[in-house]
Amino acid sequence: MAETTSWIPVWFPLMVLGCFGLNWLVRKVNVWLYESSLGENRHYLPPGDLGWPFIGNMLSFLRAFKTSDPDSFTRTLIKRYGPKGIYKAHMFGNPSIIVTTSDTCRRVLTDDDAFKPGWPTSTMELIGRKSFVGISFEEHKRLRRLTAAPVNGHEALSTYIPYIEENVITVLDKWTKMGEFEFLTHLRKLTFRIIMYIFLSSESENVMDALEREYTALNYGVRAMAVNIPGFAYHRALKARKTLVAAFQSIVTERRNQRKQNILSNKKDMLDNLLNVKDEDGKTLDDEEIIDVLLMYLNAGHESSGHTIMWATVFLQEHPEVLQRAKAEQEMILKSRPEGQKGLSLKETRKMEFLSQVVDETLRVITFSLTAFREAKTDVEMNGYLIPKGWKVLTWFRDVHIDPEVFPDPRKFDPARWDNGFVPKAGAFLPFGAGSHLCPGNDLAKLEISIFLHHFLLKYQVKRSNPECPVMYLPHTRPTDNCLARISYQ
């Protein structure tokens, strides 16, 4: 029997070595681009990996967030480099530092001497260079000062309650007659209707539906790779922004013309306030500033509220003991209402202590905002590591909100953990950010959520069609079926 001889071509080992060598060279490109210029200081960078040229670590980020375990992205960093709480990476087109602990996140968000807003250029192209995400610290303070009171002020919130409540009551009754429907989709329409009325006095269903569709496309592009080629989410998002800007420009131009002709409405909305406001030097906002503020507020003002309402409602229905406690609180508010008072008052919403715990726990569990972006204004030392000037810093809220040392059994929905005035340590609960860049519409958002849950708890129940439906995490945490469900009376 002839002896069988196995052989390997002489070029095969060379090809394998060549592949490994090429891989090593390619993986070093970002190191040469961003670390070499630091000289000896590069040795003080946090542990981590800058990934591939151009795409950096985005593939592993997107891969993790398209699974049922998005936290595997940072867990891999911790497993590979240890629980440092600070890691280098290349994210959204920039050399970056990811911080994952309450202490590091708090410092980054509150130290305005060391850090400034650092949103990626791709995000600013979508949200607007004159919005809160794209302007300097001084401009941010000015714009926030001019717009805060009309959004979050006591008088403004009291004025919004009747309109919010009227719409909530109407849609809840309507939904009981619709059979099966996408709960999240209709919640977003509700919250968009409310924010459109507050800002623009608009109640046109056609206009609202068209704009809301554009916002959906816009949001899918914010967390996507910045590939401006047809077929990619970012390209669709840029087209959506152009449509939104054109629509808002038309509205602003029409309102300015009405004011020139002295055609004034008895009702003042947010656009009127934006057209009227002047800073201490008498400077007003130009059209670009107004449009970017409108685009940002209308987006944040309906996306976060709609998603939070959906998850809070679902969590309440899944936890009967929590639901009963929250319902009892709302019934007590009704019993304590002064005779002759119709509808909720701001004072009553601030008595909803347990419901506020439900909302906070929902915000903690779902972590609506994945991260905030900052940029180092100078070389910064943190935890013994260097954050180089000009590098982006990402505060990773998901890790902060599931820290078991602060929140025992962190994956569990448990509003009772907030009992007895429990306040997490500074930086451990950041649903609206922190510091001077705290979300400017947070009080309005919580008011909307509380009013909806008040009426839902008193009369309604929700039954999901697919309770085991998979969850997607980009751009925001939601069921893939948009929470297909039925609403009925209790």
Curated annotation (Swiss-Prot):
One of its GO terms (molecular function) is ent-kaurenoic acid monooxygenase activity. GO terms for biological process: gibberellin biosynthetic process. Its cofactor is heme. Pfam families: p450 (PF00067). Keywords: Endoplasmic reticulum, Heme, Iron, Membrane, Metal-binding, Monooxygenase, Oxidoreductase, Transmembrane, Transmembrane helix. Widely expressed. Highly expressed in influorescence stem, influorescence, and silique tissue. Weakly expressed in cauline and rosette leaves. Expressed at a higher level in stem and influorescence than AtKAO2/CYP88A4. Its main location: endoplasmic reticulum. GO terms for cellular component: endoplasmic reticulum; endoplasmic reticulum membrane. It comes from the Eukaryota. It catalyses: ent-kaur-16-en-19-oate + 3 reduced [NADPH--hemoprotein reductase] + 3 O2 = gibberellin A12 + 3 oxidized [NADPH--hemoprotein reductase] + 4 H2O + 4 H(+); ent-kaur-16-en-19-oate + reduced [NADPH--hemoprotein reductase] + O2 = ent-7alpha-hydroxykaur-16-en-19-oate + oxidized [NADPH--hemoprotein reductase] + H2O + H(+); ent-7alpha-hydroxykaur-16-en-19-oate + reduced [NADPH--hemoprotein reductase] + O2 = gibberellin A12 aldehyde + oxidized [NADPH--hemoprotein reductase] + 2 H2O + H(+); gibberellin A12 aldehyde + reduced [NADPH--hemoprotein reductase] + O2 = gibberellin A12 + oxidized [NADPH--hemoprotein reductase] + H2O + 2 H(+). Heme binds at C439. CDD domains: CYP90-like. Its EC number is 1.14.14.107. It is a single-pass membrane protein. Catalyzes three successive oxidations of ent-kaurenoic acid giving gibberellin 12 (GA12), a key step in gibberellins (GAs) biosynthesis. GAs, which are involved many processes, including stem elongation, play a central role in plant development. Belongs to the cytochrome P450 family. This is Ent-kaurenoic acid oxidase 1.
